Amino acid sequence: MNPQHDRRQYVSMTPCTYSVLLLCLGLLAFPTAFPGPAISADVYFSPDGGIRQHLVRTIQQSRQHIDVAVYQITSTELASALVTAKDRGVRIRILTDQENLQSSGPALRILRTSGVAIRSLGIVEQRLMHNKFAVFDDRVVATGSYNWTQSAERANYENLVLLDDSEVVTRFQREFNRLWRQAEPW
């Protein structure tokens, strides 16, 4: 090998090395690009990840209100947990898609006969109410791909995230209230 060739190659890499070094030092000086507190999140998966049991526990811990916006509800276990919460004095509101009401199964009948407020979207603008979230006591949001159905728990690959960030909760509550005002009572 030619010693001058090696030297030139080393010299040509030096500015690149310095740039990388400065970049690393800059990142150490400013550890986060997103100031503010970190958001706490619990993440669950199905099948076999226990999403339903985590939702039931969150329902049981609620004391004031639960607002649920889901495309479909067929889980009688979740419906029963909501009715039990209602019997404890927790205000329950369910927002679902019109199509879900037309094929209402036992879960929706349990909720309806127990006096839970249920409204549907999809009539006015022919859009699906395809949200999947719930707000618990203005303190926790549950959101993800998980419909409140038997198949979501046992057969589908689904996810659910529980978030307790007040700004995130407020935004979801605001969206629920907006949709609730547009929805038709059942």
Question: Predicted segments — roles?
Answer:
Residues 6-22:
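Bacterial N-terminal signal peptides that target proteins for export
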Residues 19-31:
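Bacterial N-terminal signal peptides
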Residues 72-76, 98-102, 124-128, 140-141, ...:
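Solvent-exposed loop/turn segments at secondary-structure junctions
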Residues 42-47, 68-71, 118-120:
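Short, flexible loop segments at the rims of nucleotide/cofactor-binding pockets, characterized by
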Residues 136, 140-186:
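Signature of lipid phosphatidyltransferase scaffolds
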Residues 35-41:
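Boundary at the C-terminal end of the N-terminal hydrophobic targeting segment
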Residues 67-70, 93-96, 120, 134-135, ...:
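Structural recognition of the beta-strand scaffold that forms the well-ordered cores
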Residues 57-117:
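Primarily the HKD phosphodiesterase
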